[in-house]
Amino acid sequence: MPNIVDRFGQLVDDAISKPKLARQLLLLGYRAKDVQLLLAPEKELTPARQYAAQIAMDAMIAPLAHPQRAALVNIFMPCELLHAFHLLPMFAEATACYLNGAAAERGFIHYAESAGISPTLCSYHKALLGMGLSGTAGKPLFTACTSIACDANNLTFRRLAQHYGIPHFYLDVPYDHDEYAVAEVSDRLREFAAFLEDATHQKLDEAALQQAVAHSGRTLELLQQAQAAKAGRNLHNDVTSEFYEVFVTHTMLGTPQAEQYARKLLADIEASPMGGGTRLLWAHAVPFYQAPVRERLNFSAENQLITCDMNADTLGCYMNPDKPFESMAARLVNNIFNGSAQHRIQRALELCRMQQIDGVVYFCQWGCKQTMGAAQLFKSALEAEGYPVLLLDGDGCDRANTMDGQTATRLDAFLEMLHSKQEALV
């Protein structure tokens, strides 16, 4: 028998042909959840994780409620410039996951596929396309994306810009991690600033941009300390909180809320007890809604989710407020998702060593060619260093592409192997 969330999702699906109604229904559901998060937060969550749930929900509601100030962007687009212009970023992964949380993702994915979008495209992008092409997202001010890390970016954001008749900005990031690439991207970000001035009919407030970059710098420094502090600690973590943190480490960088979260997270981790459990690194998207994943990893002292590599993609990046464009460019160029898969492999090894990881789950997201293409290379490299890797197929947002039975069987076998390995060392 369908529960209240499933019924709500069906209401939204039934209203897609009336996009204003569908948007109002989503906003009603999201705002109700926002009130619950504020007045009755989940008690098992640490203070930082409770705060993350609140600010992520707020960041999802704002562009949906005010599309005239919204920008459709990809997850890696530097958003300090948007914050300086008081614009509201909306990105594919967040849109899709919140639709999933409302049990409404399938209707929008089906809408996109019915409009000619390939079924093999990343489900996150199909959900955003369905929201946009149906009119449910409202008409944003513009679209903007980078070439990192997904070839769906060009299709998704260009198609939406053409559909709405709005400007589109594309930031092509060079493959190499060097000073020439940083200089090139810095110039393109200055062009993006001019693009924003044209779109908003406002001049860039350079002091506001410097302040945003300063927030980013302090946030990244605190997050780096938090990642290091995880070593040997028994963390009270859950899979959904790792998704919320993706907001902080990407589109919310440059905001005081992101800095506040990072400060709270460091305090929570430093207050955590030492020792215990099998320690896991998760690579790529986390299917937070899947029961087999939640049941085995949420708040588990035995099987602990320590880190998702998407929340460690820019560790060690220094942000200089006096050189905002160069700082944003360096963060983008040196992102582990830019260029060779070796960058991502090396970051995973750094995290494994630093955080005393026992095993790695490498999630092959439906439609993500980069992640699936690097899977065997990743597995071979980490296992050569003594870190077992589970390659797990699935979908981080579309229930139709998930197989709970297979996920449960493979996770159980992997965790049992890690437990046996630990017992043999005792």
Report residues per predicted region:
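An N-terminal, globular interaction/scaffold subdomain
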Residues: 50-121, 125-137
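Internal, well-ordered alpha/beta segment that forms a basic, Gly-enriched binding/recognition surface
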Residues: 125-225
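C-terminal hydrophobic structural anchor segments
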Residues: 339-386, 390
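A charged, amphipathic alpha-helical module
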Residues: 2-69, 186, 190, 194-312, ...
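Short, flexible loop segments at the rims of nucleotide/cofactor-binding pockets, characterized by
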Residues: 48-50, 117-124, 147, 335-341
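Structural motif
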Residues: 73-76, 145-149, 282-287, 364-366
